[in-house]
Amino acid sequence: MENTEKFTNNKQIINFLTEQFPLCFTAANNPAKPLKIGIFQDLAVRLENEERVSKTQLRGALRQYTLSWRYLHCIKVSEKRVDLDGNEGDAVSAEHAEHALKTLKESKDKVFAKQKKVQKEAAPAKAAKQVNVPKRTEKKELKKESSVDLSNYKEATHSELALKQTVKVLLGKSPVSAVVVEISKDDIQVELASGMMVKVKAKHLIV
């Protein structure tokens, strides 16, 4: 029986697009390709009978995909844009390449500024109360994560998060891996690799 359960977040829709159109949309561990101008209209036609995703959801997922650092990195002058079947079309213009570079810089600056703010806010709390100091093995784990390539991540939004979703928490000196365990109206509770439970705002998570 065909699965008609509706998608509930952008991540599911993007994964669906990479499966349906692998020559156009690429998974997070592969380089992205510049998309054809007007790709949304092509998607709307191809997925007209797809009950699991609405046009509104499709537009939101497409926006998240094209605003990811990985995608913005691929928008370079003369790179060929592709359609849903991977056929090359027009080249990326200098104007579009410049806009992508500007958007990428602004996005990175925003994430790193929030990371610094979290570090600054966490410092007094740490001085006042020591909470579950990680063992040496855990410290090594966190240290290893400091070299994580953030180009595949973007700031999370509350509505896109799902239970058991793997995320990165902007906590301390580097993003820390965590799993979403509870979603409330204002906060997101995550479980760190050390087993510690932390409540944060969605703006302190990247996906």
Curated annotation (Swiss-Prot):
This is RNA chaperone ProQ. It comes from Psychromonas ingrahamii (strain DSM 17664 / CCUG 51855 / 37). Belongs to the ProQ family. The gene is proQ. It is found in: Cytoplasm. Keywords: Chaperone, Cytoplasm, RNA-binding. RNA chaperone with significant RNA binding, RNA strand exchange and RNA duplexing activities. It comes from the Bacteria. The keyword Transit peptide does not apply. GO terms for cellular component: cytosol. One of its GO terms (biological process) is post-transcriptional regulation of gene expression. It holds the Pfam family ProQ_C.
